[in-house]
């Protein structure tokens, strides 16, 4: 009888210990999650949620406007030497609005930089704030991105450099259709569309043209883009599907 009671007490103690361990693990995970996101907000800036139900059409391409400024070489595009994608993508958006500025010049004015030409996401909003332009960093779904494009402005996004890598890259989206996303990218080795919209290596098909020259130099298959756009990782779990909205 006493032996049975002792066994019962032992089981209760073990059960309580297991429960305590589970509680401590859950508490640690929640605390780590909260602290991680507080640090992310401080370092990278807050994100505004922005979601859309659907886009207006199956495809849309931003076109150069009357005030769009080309680079000194006569092209819409310029390429970075090393880092600086935050400045080059920001310069592309400004040139679309009629402001003559190059990527290197812009990057010098991007705040919150690290070594190697890398900038925190809040550097984009800080750059435009210096120019009196309200730019909000957002996180949402692809429909929200489509709806922003349909306002006729290129949209800066944050994507992975490669699907299986954690390196982040700023690029400018200028269009989409049912199969691909179209970008103005400042890394020359990723360019896969020529000035007439014809696909070049490593692309396998032909992109549609838009006037005398296209307003994009890179296409990414839609499903691959969504994987690249998902930048969530252990150190930044909530920072995914990031794009910038100009007011």
Give residue spans per PLM region.
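N-terminal targeting leaders characterized by basic, low-complexity, disordered sequences
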Residues: 1-8
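Active-site-adjacent structural segments surrounding the nucleophilic cysteine of cysteine proteases
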Residues: 9-115, 161-164, 177, 246
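Noncatalytic regulatory segments and standalone regulatory/sensor domains
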Residues: 21-23, 114, 150, 154, ...
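Stable alpha-helical elements in mature extracytoplasmic
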Residues: 81, 86-90, 120-127, 141-145, ...
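Structured segments of extracytoplasmic/periplasmic soluble domains
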Residues: 91-100, 113, 127-134, 148-152
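Helix N-cap and loop-to-helix transition residues
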Residues: 102-103, 120, 141, 177, ...
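Active-site-adjacent substructure of cysteine-protease-like catalytic cores
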Residues: 134-192
């Amino acid at each position: 009888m006493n032996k049975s009671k002792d066994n019962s007490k032992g089981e209760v103690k073990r059960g309580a210990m297991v429960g305590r361990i589970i509680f401590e693990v859950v508490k640690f995970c929640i605390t780590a999650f909260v602290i991680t996101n507080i640090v992310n907000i401080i370092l990278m800036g807050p994100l505004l949620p922005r979601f859309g139900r659907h886009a207006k059409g199956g495809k849309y391409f931003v076109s150069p406007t009357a005030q769009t400024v080309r680079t000194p070489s006569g092209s819409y595009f310029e390429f970075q030497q090393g880092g600086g994608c935050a400045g080059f993508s920001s310069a592309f958006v400004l040139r679309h609005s009629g402001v003559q500025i190059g990527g290197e010049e812009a990057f010098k004015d991007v705040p919150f930089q690290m070594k190697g030409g890398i900038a925190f996401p809040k550097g984009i909003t800080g750059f435009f704030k210096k120019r009196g332009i309200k730019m909000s960093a957002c996180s949402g779904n692809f429909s929200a991105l489509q709806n922003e494009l349909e306002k006729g402005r290129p949209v800066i996004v944050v994507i992975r450099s490669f699907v299986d890598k954690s390196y982040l890259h700023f690029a400018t989206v200028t269009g989409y259709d049912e199969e691909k996303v179209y970008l103005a990218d400042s890394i020359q080795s990723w360019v896969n569309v020529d000035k007439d919209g014809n696909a070049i290596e490593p692309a396998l098909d032909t992109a549609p043209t838009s006037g005398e020259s296209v307003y994009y130099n890179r296409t990414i298959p839609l499903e691959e883009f969504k994987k690249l756009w998902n930048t969530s990782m252990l150190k930044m779990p909530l920072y995914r599907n990031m794009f910038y909205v100009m007011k």
